[in-house]
């Protein structure tokens, strides 16, 4: 191989790597969501769908919803992201917890104490009961459920801030009732999903 050919190959390789890097950067551009009243914010990949308070319905499409109608904000993976797998949906959500009669909890203990009327159920994790997010300590709970061959797993995080009870959640649904069975996420896909949701969760912060 002469020097001219070698130089040409190096140039082609460099251009290809630069193009791939540029595509990767654009695919992972970051957007910031700020609550209408400015009380909180978080960051998320711009390719994900985000729905805000009062306009949550477009983010509710899976058999078991991963966004609640009363959410303050909800971010979901696009359906095509993991096509042809058994993943139903994945989301990060922010809610304000209210008790029966739309009465807010009046203190931190009431905010994080499991309540029979909670939907989803909030059961404090024995293995990992607390998580620091945005400099604030949240109580960590879990919830799961099944419905007609579909299942959901949720990690819930609650904190009492400025006289309001906030709940952050990361939810994943999947199905196992198809014939033939759909494939599960590959290890790289699972890692991508886990890291993305964790990054969104830990980007959350209160504005005051």
Question: What label would you give each PLM region?
Answer:
Residues 6, 21-22, 48:
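Short, compositionally biased
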Residues 29-31, 164:
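Short structural boundary motif marking the start of a folded domain
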Residues 18-23, 27:
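Boundary at the C-terminal end of the N-terminal hydrophobic targeting segment
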Residues 7-16:
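Bacterial N-terminal signal peptides
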Residues 1-7:
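Bacterial N-terminal signal peptides that target proteins for export
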């Amino acid at each position: 191989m002469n020097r001219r050919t070698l130089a040409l190959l190096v140039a082609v390789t460099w251009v290809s790597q630069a193009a791939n890097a540029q595509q990767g950067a654009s695919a992972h551009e970051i957007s910031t969501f700020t609550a209408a009243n400015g009380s909180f914010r978080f960051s998320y990949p711009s390719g994900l769908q985000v729905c805000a308070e009062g306009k949550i319905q477009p983010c509710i499409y899976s058999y078991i919803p991963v966004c609640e109608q009363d959410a303050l904000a909800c971010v979901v993976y696009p359906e095509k992201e993991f096509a042809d797998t058994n993943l139903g949906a994945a989301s990060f959500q922010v809610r304000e917890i209210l008790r029966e009669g739309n009465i807010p909890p009046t203190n931190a203990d009431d905010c994080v104490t499991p309540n029979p009327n909670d939907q989803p159920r909030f059961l404090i994790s024995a293995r990992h009961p607390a998580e620091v997010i945005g400099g604030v300590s949240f109580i960590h709970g879990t919830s799961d459920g099944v419905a007609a061959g579909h299942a959901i797993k949720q990690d819930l995080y609650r904190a009492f801030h400025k006289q309001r009870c906030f709940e952050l959640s990361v939810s994943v649904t999947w199905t196992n009732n198809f014939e033939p069975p759909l494939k599960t996420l590959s290890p790289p896909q699972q890692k991508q999903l886990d890291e993305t949701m964790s990054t969104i969760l830990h980007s959350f912060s209160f504005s005051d």
